Swiss-Prot record:
Gene that produces this protein: ENTPD5
GO cellular component terms attached to this protein's record: endoplasmic reticulum; extracellular region; extracellular space
Organism: Homo sapiens
Record note on pH: Optimum pH is 7.5-8.0.
Name this protein carries in UniProt: Nucleoside diphosphate phosphatase ENTPD5
Compartment(s) of residence: Endoplasmic reticulum; Secreted
Active site: 172
Length: 428
């Protein structure tokens, strides 16, 4: 098999990541992601597998990673990834936890088909829920996780203690940053020419980058900085997760649905929607009636005023992001694809101003709307406001939009699996 950047950097991360980290009361930032006492049960096998579930607000995704270790004690090589997903996410089953867990059961069949039976009992299965469950009442989130744990317990796979839990939002940002910068080769050697990462989910959004200026470090609020050592270098990351600022949560805020008690019989209206539209939308297990302004204004300007109220003054704006280079994925990528700004397979490079240009084009032609998402104008306007008025990016800031790097899904799952393998003792 030909050596790829993905292979090279996977080997490097397993051997070189150290956990000298200052985050959340001096604890290691990944403490709690995986149990450090997990036994290296399948270390002696020549082929290793890991099952990682990403339980997001809009869907549940499974990543089945395959690693090859040619000789005992030799560093494993990332050989491939099997990916699948289901919609809606677990949070949609807030009052039917058993039904929610059944969606995970279906994805476990993908793992069974991908992993030889002889390896099942040696392969760990882990589920990390993100913002969708963080938004739920604690007792309801726990009920969902309990049912998932029962599904895991009945499965033929290795189920370590703590394998089903809700992941902290900051960990999402850090692990995604590690994944992208390893796979793009930015952390090779002693260089620190890294790229920042922007992740826009359904319920939350994350921004992570390596500050280059002392001013940024001095002016950053407490809790936004995380230090760790890698390749004999210390990296101090700026990272923060904003709960409630994901794309779909922002729709509710824009519509004013978060300020209204009870949704029955109420239709939420917006200048971001086609004037004639009357529809319903389900998010987080709740049904919302929504529509366009039948008599009021519609179009980009009134729409932008609505989304601006959601973000203005509510996010920290580090000045140096205006000059940084960032990878953007999840809904940034999806909406750019939906509007033909980038290719679905290849991704592409955009400037922040490109999102505003497309938002104006879509919003000012709402009466010609015929297909696709009725929220397209609102989503593009929100992304523009989030980038410019939320994070403080300049119009000219360049964004690399991608779904995969070297054929591996972007996001936190691979970065989390690195730590899973370390906890299994594979790098020893």
């Amino acid at each position: 098999m030909a050596t790829s950047w993905g292979t090279v950097f996977f080997m490097l991360v397993v051997s070189c990541v150290c956990s000298a980290v200052s985050h959340r009361n001096q604890q290691t930032w990944f403490e709690g992601i995986f149990l450090s006492s997990m036994c290296p049960i399948n270390v002696s096998a020549s082929t290793l597998y890991g099952i990682m579930f990403d339980a997001g607000s809009t869907g549940t995704r499974i990543h089945v990673y395959t690693f090859v270790q040619k000789m005992p004690g030799q560093l494993p090589i990332l050989e491939g990834e099997v990916f699948d997903s289901v919609k809606p996410g677990l949070s949609a089953f807030v009052d039917q936890p058993k039904q929610g867990a059944e969606t995970v059961q279906g994805l476990l069949e993908v793992a069974k088909d991908s992993i030889p039976r002889s390896h099942w009992k040696k392969t760990p299965v882990v589920l990390k829920a993100t913002a969708g469950l963080r938004l739920l009442p604690e007792h309801k989130a726990k009920a969902l996780l309990f049912e998932v744990k029962e599904i895991f317990r009945k499965s033929p796979f290795l189920v370590p203690k703590g394998s089903v839990s809700i992941m902290d939002g900051s960990d999402e940002g850090i692990l995604a940053w590690v994944t992208v910068n390893f796979l793009t080769g930015q952390l090779h050697g002693h260089r620190q020419e890294t790229v920042g990462t922007l992740d826009l989910g359904g319920a939350s959004t994350q921004i992570t980058f390596l500050p280059q200026f002392e001013k940024t470090l001095e002016q950053t609020p407490r809790g936004y900085l995380t230090s760790f050592e890698m390749f004999n270098s210390t990296y101090k990351l700026y990272t923060h997760s904003y709960l409630g600022f994901g794309l779909k949560a922002a729709r509710l805020a824009t519509l004013g649905a978060l300020e209204t008690e009870g949704t029955d019989g109420h239709t939420f209206r917006s200048a971001c929607l086609p004037r004639w539209l009357e529809a319903e939308w389900i998010f987080g297990g709740v049904k919302y009636q929504y529509g366009g302004n039948q008599e009021g204004e519609v179009g980009f300007e009134p729409c932008y005023a609505e989304v601006l109220r959601v973000v203005r003054g509510k996010l920290h704006q580090p000045e140096e992001v205006q000059r940084g280079s960032f990878y953007a994925f999840s809904y940034y990528y999806d909406r750019a694809v939906d509007t033909d700004m980038i290719d679905y397979e290849k991704g592409g490079i955009l400037k922040v101003e490109d999102f505003e240009r497309k938002a104006r084009e879509v919003c000012d032609n709402l009466e010609n709307f015929t297909s696709g998402s009725p929220f397209l104008c609102m989503d593009l306007s929100y992304i523009t406001a989030l980038l410019k008025d939320g994070f403080g990016f300049a119009d000219s800031t360049v964004l690399q939009l991608t779904k995969k790097v070297n054929n591996i899904e972007t996001g936190w799952a691979l970065g989390a699996t690195f730590h899973l393998l370390q906890s299994l003792g594979i790098s020893h």
